Amino acid sequence: MPGVVFDLDGTLVHSAPDIHAAVNKALAEEGGAPFTLAEITGFIGNGVPVLIQRVLAARGEAPDAHRQAELQGRFMAHYEADPATLTSVYPGAEAAIRHLRAEGWRIGLCTNKPVGASRQILSLFGLLELFDAIIGGESLPQRKPDPAPLRATAAALNEEVVLYVGDSEVDAATAEAAGLRFALFTEGYRHAPVHELPHHGLFSHHDELQDLLRRLLA
């Protein structure tokens, strides 16, 4: 059977609340004002370094490598210590992946989240065993939307990957650059209207994924 690759944040798990909490904990240590959940959700998608860059820019701080590294380190310490208290798996996501595996599909994960945190979250929800390959934000020099991470995930699966499943502009651009079909989960963290994102199919609940795959492969 061929392979299918998933994004993580905003596609399989609603992780923004824990990311939000970790950012605000790091800022509180220095007396910084908290961000709202909506603000932090808007910063998610391009990996931790860009998340912290956006936090600092929103605070009106000029770019500074030392400041970036310092805040990023404290954010990661808080996040890795407590990555899933407020996080939830999207309804139907686990069942959809288990069904795919039962049919013989190879399953990959391509995310801009660090591999350690990704594995930790998947393990806490009993999902880690379902993935045959995981590529994260530090696995390669490039991050999504560069196609290299998605291509590396596909290569690690040793199967023809027929679909990338994601939720955002970053994911759509990654699939397009890699020359793969893209299925858009509409309930994630995208900013643009659906019609502005290149996609081959879309779904609002993971229960719909099986039928979508069948239509795309017909």
Swiss-Prot record:
It comes from Cereibacter sphaeroides (Rhodobacter sphaeroides). One of its GO terms (molecular function) is phosphoglycolate phosphatase activity. Keywords: Carbohydrate metabolism, Hydrolase, Magnesium, Metal-binding. This is Phosphoglycolate phosphatase. Its EC number is 3.1.3.18. Pathway: Organic acid metabolism; glycolate biosynthesis; glycolate from 2-phosphoglycolate: step 1/1. Its cofactor is Mg(2+). GO terms for biological process: carbohydrate metabolic process; DNA repair; glycolate biosynthetic process. GO terms for cellular component: cytosol. The keyword tRNA processing does not apply.
